[in-house]
Amino acid sequence: MSVALFCGPPPAVSFGCKDGRGRKGMVRSKDIVRQTVKPPAHACRLIGWNKYPGSVVPTNSSLSPSPTALDDEIELDLSPFLIIYKDGRIERLKGTTVIPACPEVATKDVIIDPATGVSVRLYLPNVVDLPSKKLPVLVYFHGGGFVIENTGSPNYHNYLTLLAAKSGLLIVSVNYRLAPEHPIPASFDDCMAGFNWVVSHSAGPAPEPWLARHGDLTQILISGDSAGGTVTHYVLLRADAGVIEGAALVHPYFLGSKRLENQTEEDFEFHEKLWRLSTPDTEGLDDPLINPLAPGAPSLAGLKCKRAVVFVAELDFLVERGRMYYDALVKSGWGGKAELVHQEGVGHVFHLSDYSGDVSVDMMAKMVAFLRGE
């Protein structure tokens, strides 16, 4: 059995628009596939955020607007992530393509909760030469601002396939529910459920044979990028002591009510809107779920792992928040070993789209070394 980086072409149908229209000029086209998911009520009670009208209008200005024009009126524009229309449709502009799991290269999908539909994608590296060897297990949480991406997204599928091949770890990637259809804390709850599902395999009959046969449940690590890094912190606070060996937070999506010097006003306002859309009952950007350093947030001394690494990128608008998190962790009295990896000249989650660049290769090497405990 071999591990391949690519498992074949993506499905013939790509769900969601990817035509790069930007914020305006919204037109209907028979070639565009739209998601038509009705959002929860809170997503329609928006307080005047970016209500741009659609551009489909009658050619004769004396005519009344057509139903099509009315359908395309925008309630909230969060390009390049998603657009919410006044008729209730949610259109995701990226992060919706799914690459099927590939059993022939040791990847597969498993539904862990039929009630919610939460699933995981497993990545098993080549074990032909050492069939009885138990592999450390990495539980991974993908990014996407809590509103886009999934375990089958090309960037994540290809990156985790490569990571499994190079590290020799059995990887379990959690496919959690997205906002705004499923407001936070649904995503956090789903990721915690995915983590607990993995841990449960150490306490009796194991429902998943790959984990039972090949997983070393005494060596569990967790990791996530962007929003997945936020979830990683959440899980570290709630896991049982002694269960997690190590944690890697990659460009973690931490926010705060104070705009930092490296953050533009546009970026700051965009992510505030995104967070409020995802979390209707939020306290704002100092909600401990998104700002682990906010007043009243749980102490970082309570993280349940032996070692941790925080990756930050120089050109990422989140870089200073990541640094602040690392500094606070070191000063918290936490008893583990912490490491900060700062990479220059690159931006947010650059490593998901570039595997061959020098900085990406260096990052992969550092990640593999951390996961292996080297």
From Swiss-Prot:
> Where, subcellularly, is it found?
Plastid, Amyloplast
- An example Gene Ontology biological process: defense response
Q: Does the keyword Transferase apply?
A: no
One Gene Ontology term of the molecular function aspect? lyase activity
**What keywords sit in the KW lines?**
Amyloplast, Lyase, Plant defense, Plastid, Transit peptide
The Gene Ontology CC terms held by the record are: amyloplast
Keyword Plastid assigned to the entry: answer is: yes
One short Pfam name that applies is Abhydrolase_3
Per UniProt, the transit peptide runs over 1-68
Tissues expressed in? Highly expressed in pistil and bulb scales. Lower expression in stem, and barely detected in root, leaf, petal and stamen.
User: SUPFAM superfamilies from the xrefs?
Assistant: alpha/beta-Hydrolases (SSF53474)
Task: Report the EC number(s), separated by commas if there are several.
Answer: 4.2.99.22
Q: What broad class describes the main subcellular location of this protein?
A: plastid
Provide the catalytic activity annotation: 6-tuliposide A = tulipalin A + D-glucose
Instruction: Show the InterPro entries listed in the entry.
Output: AB_hydrolase_3 (IPR013094), AB_hydrolase_fold (IPR029058), Carboxylest/Gibb_receptor (IPR050466)
- Which residues does the entry assign to the active site, renumbered to this chain? 226, 316, 348
Q: Which Gene3D superfamilies match?
A: alpha/beta hydrolase
- Family of this protein: Belongs to the AB hydrolase superfamily.
Kindly give any further remark recorded in the entry: 6-tuliposide A and tuliposide A-converting enzyme, which are compartmentalized in the vacuoles and plastids respectively, come into contact with each other for the enzyme reaction releasing toxic tulipalin A upon cell disruption by pathogen infection or herbivore predation.
Subunit description: Homodimer.
Report the function annotation for this chain.
Answer: Lactone-forming carboxylesterases, specifically catalyzing intramolecular transesterification, but not hydrolysis. Involved in the biosynthesis of tulipalins, defensive chemicals that show antimicrobial activities against a broad range of strains of bacteria and fungi. Substrates are 6-tuliposide A > 6-tuliposide B.
Q: Can you name this protein?
A: Tuliposide A-converting enzyme b1, amyloplastic
UniProt organism field: Tulipa gesneriana (Garden tulip)
